[in-house]
From Swiss-Prot:
It comes from the Eukaryota. This is Ribosome-releasing factor 2, mitochondrial. Its main location: mitochondrion. Residues 1-29 form a transit peptide. Belongs to the TRAFAC class translation factor GTPase superfamily. Classic translation factor GTPase family. EF-G/EF-2 subfamily. It comes from Drosophila yakuba. InterPro entries: EF-G-like_DII, EFG2, EFG_II, EFG_III, EFG_III/V, EFG_V, EFG_V-like, G_TR_CS. Gene3D superfamilies: 3.30.230.10, 3.30.70.240, Elongation Factor G (Translational Gtpase), domain 3, P-loop containing nucleotide triphosphate hydrolases, Translation factors. Keywords: GTP-binding, Mitochondrion, Nucleotide-binding, Protein biosynthesis, Transit peptide. PROSITE patterns: G_TR_1, G_TR_2. Mitochondrial GTPase that mediates the disassembly of ribosomes from messenger RNA at the termination of mitochondrial protein biosynthesis. Not involved in the GTP-dependent ribosomal translocation step during translation elongation. The lineage of its organism: Eukaryota, Metazoa, Ecdysozoa, Arthropoda, Hexapoda. GO terms for biological process: mitochondrial translation; ribosome disassembly.
Length: 712
């Protein structure tokens, strides 16, 4: 039977749902739908931009402001208190006869998994830059995520009203740091009163926004002959020349035209659309969301240049008459239960429709909602290409291993790249009676956030959380209190060290036991070696090959699982063992021996090998960008040197500031934000993100072991 797929986002295994009822399938894509994500570095103005879109589209009656805590998309208590986006949220609004489904995503590195989930559902993205800062650390991260999903994108350079904004530097950053080909459709200009206006390259108009009506209206005036017009005409000619090298239709017109001035605007826009959807160029627009400038033209550009659903996802035509879509996020609502956010790829979903997952679990869609952050408007049906919230799908999301997927799953799966946890800590309920409620809360939070790791430490008997940073862990604790009314205690934050073997080792382990009257016997020879590629391999040397050829594929899979499971917890601090390969030399399995016994023996053999070879610790390293006034740099660098930091570069940042690029061990950065504020008297800013692991010297290793044992 052909399996229609509902594909989940990261760590929420790939799910494909198909319609069981006998219906005639009609392709109902609308060319008027745009599914977009909005991405940015923290504080670039992404949420403010989204709030302006909702306001000008008529979905809200007042302007939402981050600093006032009244935004639509930042609806969690923690988001409004801190002024940052934590969870991605979906909103739907009309604009110029189009329907835009927008996913607002977090900008903080601790919540990058939310970005990854959202990109499963969109056809294009808007990347917001801070006009005073250009391309920043998290901009590079989200750009690479969009690259992985092959998403067309627009650039919106925000905060161009600021005196220190530098549009040319932002464009240069796009070329140098993101290695993309930007095409500037607008340039900033200040009116006589000093207010930001925009010169449009294609239409040769000046756009000025009226602030008396909060930017709802703007006037566009053709530029009179002047230096500004001549410069803009040159920019228009450069744009046409650039696009004609990428688009045959425009090139044919240019060849037959005497002057670039006679090239029709509509022809330029069509060529720009084709080049954008084919990811040959990235259109660049500008404005100031906070000052209500440029937002309507940004929404026009979304409609004009980003693809409709029918222009992507042609691969899913193979499902024929089946209904298919992607499940990209799960949220929990106290009144409605689990809500499933779905991007519909084919067909139409209706309320009451019966669906079945590729794993054979039947579901019934009890209700459908149009998304507006945490507000929901019920609808009866949703067509292909759209985004919808489904209630009633209680078992669609489960945590299954990748190796359980069959070929059809692998064909349509996207590697989620769930980042490794960099911190972990114990979590305890306030009382024994709250244990079950806490476990249920963690289960629901894990469904929403795949980067949250929950495990049980059999040695200490504690529940252990793993997360992306101090802020991530703090938000989890706060959400458990505010949403589930459980005041949990978090233990001290511990660094998520990794381990790697010091030297190769080879051993044989033979185990015989009688369990429930059945004899269980396994003899296995394994070796551990340094290797960054495969975690498990077969030693197909002449002396071992005859034995390996007698082992059934199922037994090899069991041996592989057992061996790899032992690498999850190293002998020194319980860190994951990496850069290590297990080689199977030979194995003898007694008749009637259970798979679980074989798996346990393999794990025990690997643990013995790790103890024999010995392990070294690897500590997580963070890449920091610190911006501070020049006179504060020496004090900051002196403090960094005491933290075992490696200073890579010091660059000028504007007229008065400098930027320090540095790598430092995470273990030395606890509370560093507060320390930096003290050293710089509050004048410095910092961004930080993981950049890999590094080996440690013996003194630092001993200190790390003592910290892991709670002795420091």
């Amino acid at each position: 039977m052909l399996r229609c797929a509902w594909q989940n986002g990261p760590r929420q295994s790939n799910r494909w749902l198909r319609h069981l009822s006998n219906q005639i399938w009609k392709r109902s894509y609308s060319s008027k739908i745009r599914n977009i994500g909005i991405l940015a570095h923290i504080d670039a103005g992404k949420t403010t931009t989204t709030e302006r879109m909702l306001f000008y589209a008529g979905k809200t009656r007042a302007l939402g402001e981050v600093h006032r805590g009244n935004t639509v998309t930042d609806y969690l208590t923690q988001e409004r208190e801190r002024g940052i986006t934590i969870c991605s949220s979906a909103v739907t609004f009309p604009w110029n006869d189009h329907r835009i489904n927008l996913l607002d995503t977090p900008g903080h590195i601790d919540f990058t998994m939310e970005v990854e989930q959202s990109l499963f559902a969109v056809d294009g993205v808007v990347v917001v830059l801070d006009g005073t800062a250009g391309v920043e650390a998290q901009t590079v991260t989200v750009w690479s995520q969009a690259d992985k999903h092959k998403l067309p994108r627009l650039i919106f350079v925000n905060k161009m009203d600021r005196p220190d904004a530098d549009f040319d530097k932002c464009v240069a950053d796009l070329k140098d740091k993101l290695e993309t080909q930007p095409v500037c459709l607008q340039y900033p200009v200040k009116n006589e009163d000093g207010v930001l206006a925009i010169n449009d390259v294609i239409t040769l108009e000046r756009l000025s926004w009226h602030q008396k009506d909060l930017g709802r209206s703007y006037k566009n005036v053709k530029l009179e002959p002047s230096d500004d017009l001549r410069q803009l005409q040159e920019k228009r000619s450069e744009l046409i020349d650039q696009l004609s090298g990428l688009d045959d239709e425009l090139a044919d017109v240019v060849i037959s035209t005497e002057s670039f001035d006679k090239v029709d605007n509509a022809l330029i826009e069509r060529a720009l659309r084709r080049a954008t959807t084919q990811q040959k160029v990235v259109p660049v627009l500008l404005g100031s969301a906070y000052k209500n400038v440029g937002i309507q033209r940004l929404m026009d550009a979304v409609n004009s240049y980003l693809p409709a659903p029918e222009e992507r996802n042609q691969i899913y035509d193979c499902f024929g008459t089946e209904v298919a879509g992607k499940v990209f996020k799960i949220v929990h609502d106290k009144q409605r239960g689990p809500l499933t956010l779905i991007r519909i790829l084919r067909g139409e979903i209706k309320r009451g429709m019966r669906l079945i997952s590729a794993r054979g679990q039947a579901e019934v869609v009890s209700k459908l909602y149009e998304p507006l952050a945490d507000e929901y408007r019920e609808v009866s049906a949703v067509q292909s290409g759209d985004v919808v919230i489904c209630a009633g799908l209680k078992s669609t999301v489960t945590d299954e291993e990748d190796d359980e997927l069959d070929e059809s799953d692998e064909l349509f799966a996207i590697d989620p790249q769930i980042p490794d946890a960099v911190y972990f800590c114990s979590i305890e309920p306030p009382s024994v009676s709250s244990q079950t409620a806490m476990e249920q809360a963690l289960k629901q939070l894990q469904r929403e956030d795949p980067s949250l790791r929950v495990s049980y430490d059999s040695v200490t008997g504690q529940t252990v959380l793993g997360g992306m940073g101090e802020l991530h862990m703090d938000i989890i604790k706060s959400r458990i209190l505010s949403e589930y009314k459980i005041d949990v205690d978090l233990g001290p934050l511990q660094i998520a060290y990794k381990e790697t073997i010091e030297s190769p080792a080879l051993t044989t382990l033979s185990v015989e036991k009688e369990i429930a009257g059945s004899k269980q016997s396994v003899s296995i020879t394994l070796e551990v070696v340094k290797n960054q590629a495969e975690m498990f391999s077969l030693d197909k040397s002449p002396e071992n090959l005859p034995n390996l050829n007698t082992l059934r594929p199922r037994i090899l899979q069991v041996l592989r699982k057992g061996s790899i499971s032992a690498l999850e917890r190293g002998p020194r601090v319980g860190g994951q063992v990496v850069e290590t390969q297990i080689r199977l030399h030979n194995a003898t399995i007694g008749r009637g021996t259970a798979d679980s016994f074989v798996m346990a023996t393999a794990a025990q053999c690997v643990q013995k090998l790790l103890s024999t070879s010995g392990t070294r610790l690897l500590e997580p390293i963070m890449a920091l960008q610190i911006v501070a006034p020049s006179e504060r740099i020496s004090g900051i660098m002196a403090d960094l040197s005491r933290r075992r930091a490696l200073i890579n570069d010091v660059l000028p940042k504007g007229e008065r500031n400098k930027m320090i690029l540095v790598n430092a061990p995470l273990a030395e950065l606890s509370g560093y934000s507060s320390a930096l504020r003290t050293i710089s008297s509050g004048t410095a800013s910092m961004t930080m993100q993981p950049c890999g692991f590094s080996s440690m010297n013996s003194v630092d290793e001993s200190l790390a072991e003592r910290r892991a044992q709670g002795l420091e």
